[in-house]
């Protein structure tokens, strides 16, 4: 697939602006690839589109980071892990295409060429030694959105309505295979599951108020959550492990089993609900089997 690549961002950008430019550029690459599929008649093999998207976005991001921040280390889902990053002071943690399944799917079997699922994302985050996640951006290419750590706090959430019992607690969940404890929560009348695609889409759905929380225990990697967590924290959300412990990034093993994201006012209530379904049994699970973002 031969669409022209976006221009590489200049090295003069600060880290927040660079994260935005990187996520935006990779988003352009992915949308151009979809446009090529449609221009060729609209029929495609999903695996080929997934692989092409992963490869094209990774190649552009790698070139852009090498040009703009040549001395920084990189941890990417789509590149071989270089163990020397654990000794670096600055590490970019990226997922060039979060939600490959959604990227290569139409909304339904009858959808014509030009119509695609929109719940996939591009993740770009910067980790710095002694400071943790310091910059990040998440692009939702098909929705034309890029959210960054430079956006700042947003207006208050609707937590009061949940706490008062006026409406159920809305929890973002995997549309294909939610963790068992999340499915158990859905049996409660005061909880509503909202199925959606990639991990980035789920976390940002909490940030923009579409849902109240995202809790995950099926296993992820650092690139699945680093950028969404950076953006969510910049908007005042609680982002921790399920047991309340800190999320740690740029570890030797990038496996990060679980995630808890919600507004501060809802955190105590959500933790109480998780206790009722035995969530402690999944915290810290170290198996990579069955991971679903």
Residue ranges and their predicted role:
Residues 30-33, 54, 65, 100, ...:
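Residue-level signal for inorganic ion chemistry
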Residues 75-77, 125, 250:
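Solvent-exposed beta-strand sheet faces enriched in polar/charged residues
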Residues 70, 88-89, 131-134, 166-167, ...:
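Short coil/turn connectors at secondary-structure junctions
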